Amino acid sequence: MTDFEKTYQNYNPRQAALDEARALLTAAAKAAMADGTLPEAELPAFIVEIPADVKNGDIASNIAMAGARTWRKAPKMIADALLAHLPSIENSVFSKVEVAGPGFINLFLSQSFWAGVVLGACANKEYGRTDHGKGAKYNVEFVSANPTGPMHMGNARGGALGDCLSAVLDWSGYDVTREFYINDAGNQIQKFGKSLAVRYLQKYCGEEAYPLPAECYQGGDIKVLAGEFAELNGDKYVAACKGMDEETLFESEAFAALKDALVAYALPKNIAALKRDLGKYRIDYDVWFHESTLHESGAVKAVVDKLLELGACYKAEDGAIMYRSAQYAAKYGTVNKKKTEDGTEEEAKDEVLVRANGIPTYFAADIAYHYNKLATRGFAKAIDVWGADHHGHVARMKGAMDAIGLNGEDLDVVLMQMVNLMRDGQPVRMSKRTGNAITLTDLLEEVPIDSARFLFNMHDAGSGIDFDLDQAVKTDNDNPVYYVQYAHARICSILKKMESEGVQFAGAEKVDATLLTEPSEMDLIRMLAAFPQEIVMAAEKYDPSRINRFVIDLASAFHRFYGSCRIQGADPAVQQARLALCIGVKNVIFNVLTMFKINVPEKM
């Protein structure tokens, strides 16, 4: 990396300009108070922001309005006083500062500032990456599908959301760990084993002899796994299970042995399938964390003991250990409730952590798991991506972190709304191939992975998605990812064409980008300036979808620029500046697509 390129490492021009504006206005206020123009007072809280209309400046501030009560003067008088005491802007990024309307202060950025944006985006191939997060350790846990069956459309959305969120956090300077929590213990595994065992017995004795209970998993995948196990093991488990009524069978040692054998066979296969499909979806986890290890290591018991010691739990008459959930959850929102004994009203509900039979609940393991993240492994933040149907669990989980001596604010939950698959404008429920509910496997066989990852990240987590299967397979501008990829390929084509005509790009350090003043050029430059801060905002708001929308707008702005500003045949100095602008846009599109693990074609 050259010294010139190092100048633009971790470069965030928009934030730098906002910070400089705040510093100038703060200095002006202090100077005005020092000479008595404004009365001495604590500086009011004020805003510096990017106005919607560039006619109102590149940056605007409400400091005069915010200070009206503090300084007991009209906002216009305050604004004029601040302007009179403003430090020289000669060596700043600003070319002009003015008062507008009732007292807004508008600041205009210099052409040399905008030129620096072009050069930074052109010279720094990782333009957009900043050190905003200062290396803070963040854990992002997402998908974490039960290994008892195939992944569904919610997992497809959660995979794209969690992976793209991890990417914007990484690009914002956080030390990110991507994690999958494998629910390989508890009731769902018992249910999985029971479902497999009944299907296995049906294979040899028929469905009438061993009807599948309603609470068992009904999917065809259970039959397939049980059939595979039968092919490997034959009927050696059947005889020991015969001659018992249903209740006796399900409590018998023979049935328990059959369940254990089936789970030992089927669970690793399902986990391997999860890993295979998520790998195909381009998700690479740093940690696969097994719930079972929390039980085997004694971590669940240790957490329950700690909560008892802290008075957050108590023992009920039947021996169950109860957690005082409402006491801690109320701070964070919804408190789970139950009916009073007479059924007339609702009261706060305490939660069972350990049942009367001594078996811990899923909630106890969940507390132990998050304690492991925040205390044992020392993450500054644990971010969980959950389906919106789990909203009732958020407050009690955050409250549990407080109860155990941690900070519930260090656990953040991103709630994700539903996905509706659409074809020909109609909802699609079943796979044409299997006749069953559409799985992630089915989706990735029909839809290009680039489209799936981009389209599932087009909306913020709180919005539902109608995923259009017809749109996802299109190879034209109706498909947003194609539109963005085409903009990149078009720039590559322009650069190659110029080279073929003997026009070589001289390098960013030799370009005079102050020559770029056309409206379409300035639109592009303003977008380039915003890019690093857009990534930071996406990270802070846990909303990577804003980057998808940004890059679509950038592609549109580039097409407008190319339609109105000639590169071929332009004045040589202007031509070099426009090539630098093209390369800057190309770098940003490349960085967005690679950040989100989407292919970046150079020709289409």
Describe the predicted segments one by one:
Residues 2-115, 123, 129-604:
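Non-catalytic interaction-recognition regions
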